């Protein structure tokens, strides 16, 4: 901002928030916030549409509502008779219900069999629906993914889904702001997934509670859009309401030509507006945290929350070293569930299943990363590779990545959420260990009794070809 500009310096978050306040909050009432984009899937939307029917309401802005199917969809191909091999009747009913709701209320749906169908937080950006400066909501925890574009994006509950459908607005209290400055440069073999796991390990699962995180610094600027989406995707795992990254030329180049993005002179005008979004010099955050990644290694979780992560060369921590009784009890409980011993190296830990996919790491760049490790090798454990969307799957097949996975012995599946949350039949057996590129390692997340170790696609692929936790840097030259 210029020295003569009378406006106060503002953060990226404040600029987007201020532009969408319909009615300011008071001590008694939340702000009324306008929503630019409402993304939907089959699991959290049925009750919301039922509410509309009961009250005789219409969807206020179907043109700002976009739906897909992902959580309940099978990742196996169609049966010879053309039917989809749903895991159970509930999954099939959920998909059928959103198809009916979309027809009845005029909502655009990209469902099973559609070439654009995919995991909601992968397919939305691919469609160009997510753009800088927007407010974006979805009935899904990892809506923060879209903050990578300089949007304010957050998950909402089912009742709020109904509220947005009916009014295109939400009642919201303004969160506080938290800057996560990432200094240094990521070393070869270290990825955005390793970075966000390290950040969460540093601040804890409650470190961002009540805040919107803005990721800044040279290491963030050096990330691709895919890496930025991975970073923002897991902001919620650090307790944040949302995660954001200021848009720049990387953002604009990624968006150019996408279906829903303005074209020609209109795109140039949009970029000019978007360039005004980054945080002003002198703007103040409520909190600031600095992370130095110059010596960061590939990360892997060992416990039952995403903050319980260590370098792949590290050892399982000893609960006895924890001075805080609550933290000690949490760690003891995690190690009991995971059946891991304090002081044991995580390298060499036996793995039963590997999962590459999800809204965290199911994009083309992620699949390339995994293929680079698997190329010319054979997997030693069951490995599922699930593209985040049909567009990603098609692009991966055009590059021959599917052949690399198949020749290695991995299963090349249809797009969907898959083993991220074990809702569609892709799940662990009790006691199995899975190195997963997803975002949550809670007890039973990937199936009752399943044990999840979160990691990057490269680390997951290294585990697949080793049959145990392995350092991907040792398997890839350069």
From Swiss-Prot:
It comes from the Bacteria. GO terms for biological process: L-leucine biosynthetic process. PROSITE patterns: ACONITASE_1, ACONITASE_2. InterPro entries: 3-IsopropMal_deHydase_lsu (IPR004430), Acnase/IPM_dHydase_lsu_aba_1/3 (IPR015931), Acoase/IPM_deHydtase_lsu_aba (IPR001030), Aconitase_4Fe-4S_BS (IPR018136), Aconitase_4Fe-4S_dom (IPR036008), IPM_dehydratase_rel_enz (IPR050067), IPMI_cat (IPR033941). The keyword Nucleotide-binding does not apply. Pathway: Amino-acid biosynthesis; L-leucine biosynthesis; L-leucine from 3-methyl-2-oxobutanoate: step 2/4. Its EC number is 4.2.1.33. It catalyses: (2R,3S)-3-isopropylmalate = (2S)-2-isopropylmalate. It is an enzyme of class 4 (lyase). Signal peptide: none annotated. Its cofactor is [4Fe-4S] cluster. The keyword Lyase applies. Belongs to the aconitase/IPM isomerase family. LeuC type 1 subfamily. HAMAP family: LeuC_type1. Catalyzes the isomerization between 2-isopropylmalate and 3-isopropylmalate, via the formation of 2-isopropylmaleate. This is 3-isopropylmalate dehydratase large subunit.
């Amino acid at each position: 901002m210029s020295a003569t500009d009378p406006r106060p310096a503002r953060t990226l978050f404040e600029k987007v928030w201020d532009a969408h306040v319909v009615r300011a909050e008071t001590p008694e009432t939340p702000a009324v916030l306008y929503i630019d984009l409402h993304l939907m899937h089959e699991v959290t939307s049925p009750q919301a549409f039922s509410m509309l029917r009961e009250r005789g309401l219409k969807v206020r802005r179907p043109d700002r509502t976009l739906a897909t199917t992902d959580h309940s969809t099978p990742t196996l191909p169609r049966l010879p008779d053309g039917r989809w091999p749903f895991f159970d009747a509930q999954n099939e009913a959920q998909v059928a219900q959103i198809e009916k709701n979309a027809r009845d209320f005029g909502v655009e749906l990209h469902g099973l069999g559609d070439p654009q169908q995919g995991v909601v937080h992968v397919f939305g950006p691919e469609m160009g629906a997510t753009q800088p400066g927007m407010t974006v909501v979805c009935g899904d925890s990892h809506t923060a993914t879209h903050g990578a574009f300089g949007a304010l994006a957050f998950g909402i509950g089912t009742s709020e889904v109904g509220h947005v459908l009916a009014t295109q607005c939400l009642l919201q209290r303004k969160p506080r702001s938290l800057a996560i400055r990432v200094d240094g440069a990521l070393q070869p073999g270290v990825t955005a997934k390793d970075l966000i796991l390290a950040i969460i390990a540093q601040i804890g699962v409650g470190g961002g509670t009540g805040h919107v995180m803005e990721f800044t610094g040279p290491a963030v600027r050096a990330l691709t859009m895919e890496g930025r989406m991975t970073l923002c995707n897991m902001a919620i795992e650090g307790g944040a309401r949302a995660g954001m990254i200021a848009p720049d030329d990387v953002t604009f180049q990624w968006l150019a030509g996408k279906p829903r993005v303005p074209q020609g002179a209109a795109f140039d005008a949009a970029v000019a507006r978007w360039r005004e979004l980054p945080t002003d010099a002198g703007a103040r955050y409520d909190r600031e945290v600095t992370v130095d990644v110059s010596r960061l290694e590939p990360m892997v979780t060992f416990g039952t929350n995403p903050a319980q992560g260590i370098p792949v060369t590290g050892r399982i921590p000893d609960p006895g070293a924890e001075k805080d009784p609550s933290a000690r009890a949490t760690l003891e409980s995690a190690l009991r569930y995971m059946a891991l011993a304090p002081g044991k190296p995580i390298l060499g830990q036996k793995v039963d299943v590997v999962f590459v996919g999800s809204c965290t790491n199911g994009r083309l760049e992620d699949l390339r990363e995994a293929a680079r490790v698997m190329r010319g090798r054979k997997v030693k454990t069951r490995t599922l590779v699930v593209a985040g969307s049909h567009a990603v799957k098609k692009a991966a097949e055009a590059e021959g990545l599917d052949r690399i996975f198949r020749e290695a012995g991995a299963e090349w599946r249809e797009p969907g959420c898959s083993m991220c949350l074990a809702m569609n039949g892709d799940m662990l057996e009790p006691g199995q260990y899975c190195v997963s590129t997803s975002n949550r390692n809670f007890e039973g997340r990937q199936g009752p009794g399943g044990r999840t170790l979160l990691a990057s696609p490269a680390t997951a692929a290294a585990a697949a070809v080793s049959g145990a936790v392995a350092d991907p840097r040792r398997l890839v030259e350069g």
